[in-house]
């Protein structure tokens, strides 16, 4: 455990609570001290949900520490069962309350005797797993619980559906554009003539889980969430799963062709090639845009990418393969699955970076000085500090990246949204230059703001005047190179002569 003021993936209990609050009529009891109970505020503030967050904190206070937690936790579970009538109550500790080493399995068994609904302990090691791993394991645990329960009662659905059908696994509350992706995936499946059997966990009932065995295949659009569940369903029912993320023109087509292969192997006779061609040429604007003069202006520009495995890998491929942009490095904070990420992106970028340290990522960005950054909320902050534009492509994110308008990243409409995001993230040089020539609302001070708040060098009046003559879209880079040149040679202030010398020395 380490103290950090920024984490890319939160602690394990956040993952468990995301899964529990994604299902309909499921309540979570969090056994935790005050301070660990920020999930309710975070969810209601960020994801703009209409419903109250179904999470209750069973507070660990001094009375609990003196007498033990069992009585309080059991009372809270039974009370919520009577008040809310949930189908399932999930009990989760946090990494703080796990220190108490209490027998929470026993608490659940005691509560189950009095509760009318089901009660379950989210069995996750809070010191070994992060938010994403815990979410994946909790979803798998809930699915297994209800399938085994249905099997014991003889309620498990037999056989497959008459027409091709799919379980879409992994869309959750607080996910990056998950609601929009979910709508786009349902639309895509309808276009392909495939019925959505279940969509879990977002908006699903735990009572729907017993019919998951009827699907022809499982689709896992997000690498981080749903793979464990899909593997369990394959093991139990022989249901094949597809884990190709349909993001970008090429990967969406590859996903559709894999679906065709999987359902044809089970007796269907479909050919989706005409559909792929129609969508690629006429519905998605991305393929046309990639051949336009606008996109050619981006060819060879430098970019860096950082995020979770799913989004960082997909955006890296789109930038390099579909838009001709030079990805200097691509990175992920999913250290536990680094091998997969390397395999996916190594041929599309110069360097692969695996790190959970935002400081290291910020330094790597400053080192290569890209034309644009594609990352999380933290990379947006880094970009503002360095005066480099940033497109947000992965969680963790702030409220502006939970858009009310329709902005999927998946499917063919997703390709349009991603293309817009990428193109608009690059600073258009003439725009900056014209503002300088003709003025506007921007003041000279705003346009020439420093790239670093803690610069130890002074610019003289003639040095600053000379710097201001340089077009805005390259001024930041010239300033950084000049300051580096001055530090290396021990100058305390930068005048016009130093600027000229730096330009000659480093080609700034």
Swiss-Prot record:
Self-association and partners: Protochlorophyllide reductase is composed of three subunits; ChlL, ChlN and ChlB. Forms a heterotetramer of two ChlB and two ChlN subunits.
Cofactor: binding details: Binds 1 [4Fe-4S] cluster per heterodimer. The cluster is bound at the heterodimer interface by residues from both subunits.
InterPro entries xref list: ChlB/BchB/BchZ, LI-POR_suB-like_C, Nase/OxRdtase_comp1, P-CP_red_C, Protochl_reductB, Protochlorophyllide_Rdtase
Metabolic or biological pathway, per its Swiss-Prot or TrEMBL entry: Porphyrin-containing compound metabolism; chlorophyll biosynthesis (light-independent)
Any one biological process term the GO annotation gives: photosynthesis, dark reaction
CDD domains, per the entry: Pchlide_reductase_B (cd01981)
Catalytic residues in the record: 294
MF term (GO), any: oxidoreductase activity, acting on iron-sulfur proteins as donors
Provenance organism: Nostoc punctiforme (strain ATCC 29133 / PCC 73102)
Protein family according to the UniProt entry: Belongs to the ChlB/BchB/BchZ family.
Origin organism lineage: Bacteria, Bacillati, Cyanobacteriota, Cyanophyceae, Nostocales
Enzyme class: oxidoreductase
Keywords associated with the record: 4Fe-4S, ATP-binding, Chlorophyll biosynthesis, Iron, Iron-sulfur, Metal-binding, Nucleotide-binding, Oxidoreductase, Photosynthesis
Top-level taxonomic group: Bacteria
Known cofactor(s): [4Fe-4S] cluster
Binding site for [4Fe-4S] cluster: 36
Pfam families found in the cross-reference section: Oxidored_nitro, PCP_red
EC number per UniProt: 1.3.7.7
UniProt-annotated binding residues for substrate: 429-430
Free-text function comment from the UniProt entry: Component of the dark-operative protochlorophyllide reductase (DPOR) that uses Mg-ATP and reduced ferredoxin to reduce ring D of protochlorophyllide (Pchlide) to form chlorophyllide a (Chlide). This reaction is light-independent. The NB-protein (ChlN-ChlB) is the catalytic component of the complex.
Protein name: Light-independent protochlorophyllide reductase subunit B
Catalyses which reaction(s): chlorophyllide a + oxidized 2[4Fe-4S]-[ferredoxin] + 2 ADP + 2 phosphate = protochlorophyllide a + reduced 2[4Fe-4S]-[ferredoxin] + 2 ATP + 2 H2O
């Amino acid at each position: 455990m380490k103290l950090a003021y920024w984490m890319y993936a939160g602690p394990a209990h956040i993952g468990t609570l995301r899964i529990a609050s994604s299902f309909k009529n499921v309540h979570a009891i969090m056994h935790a001290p005050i301070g660990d109970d920020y999930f309710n505020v975070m969810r209601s503030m960020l994801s703009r949900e209409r419903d109250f967050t179904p999470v209750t904190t069973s507070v660990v206070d001094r009375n609990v520490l003196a007498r033990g937690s069992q009585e309080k936790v059991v009372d809270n579970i039974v009370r919520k069962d009577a008040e809310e009538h949930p189908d399932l109550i999930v009990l989760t500790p946090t990494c703080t309350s796990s220190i108490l080493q209490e027998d929470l399995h026993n608490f659940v068994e005691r509560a189950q005797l009095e509760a009318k609904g089901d009660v379950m302990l989210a069995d996750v090691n809070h010191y070994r797993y992060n938010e994403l791993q815990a979410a994946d394991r909790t979803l798998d645990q809930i699915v297994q619980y209800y399938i085994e329960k249905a099997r014991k009662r003889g309620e498990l659905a037999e056989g497959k559906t008459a027409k091709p059908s799919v379980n879409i696994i992994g869309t959750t509350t607080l996910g990056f554009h998950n609601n929009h992706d979910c709508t786009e995936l349902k639309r895509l499946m309808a276009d392909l003539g495939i019925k959505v059997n279940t969509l879990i966990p977002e908006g699903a009932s735990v009572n729907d889980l017993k019919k998951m065995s009827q699907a022809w295949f499982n689709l896992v659009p997000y690498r981080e969430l749903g793979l464990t569940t899909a593997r369990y369903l394959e093991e139990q029912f022989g249901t094949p799963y597809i884990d190709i993320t349909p993001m970008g023109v090429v990967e969406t087509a590859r996903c559709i062709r894999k679906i065709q292969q999987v359902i044809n192997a089970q007796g269907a006779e479909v050919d989706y090639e005409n559909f792929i061609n129609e969508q690629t040429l006429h519905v998605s604007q991305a393929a046309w845009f990639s051949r336009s003069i606008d996109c050619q202006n981006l060819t060879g520009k430098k970019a860096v990418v950082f995020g979770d495995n799913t989004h960082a890998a997909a955006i890296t491929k789109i930038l390099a393969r579909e838009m001709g942009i030079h990805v200097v490095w691509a990175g992920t904070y999913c250290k536990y699955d680094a091998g997969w990420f390397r395999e996916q992106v190594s041929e599309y970028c110069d360097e692969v970076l695996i790190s959970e340290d935002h400081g290291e990522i910020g330094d790597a960005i400053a080192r290569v000085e890209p034309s644009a950054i594609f990352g999380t909320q933290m990379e947006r902050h880094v970009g503002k500090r360095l005066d480099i534009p940033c497109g947000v492509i992965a969680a963790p994110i702030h409220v502006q990246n939970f858009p009310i308008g329709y902005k999927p990243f998946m499917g063919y409409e997703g390709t349009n949204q991603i293309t817009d995001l990428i193109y608009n993230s690059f600073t258009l040089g003439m725009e900056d230059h014209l503002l300088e020539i003709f003025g506007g609302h921007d003041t000279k001070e705003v346009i020439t703001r420093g790239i670093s708040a803690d610069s130890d060098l002074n610019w003289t009046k003639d040095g600053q005047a000379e710097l201001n003559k340089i077009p805005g879209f390259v001024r930041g880079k010239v300033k950084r190179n000049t300051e580096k040149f001055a530090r290396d040679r021990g100058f305390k202030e930068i005048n016009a002569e130093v600027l000229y010398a730096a330009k000659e020395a480093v080609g700034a």
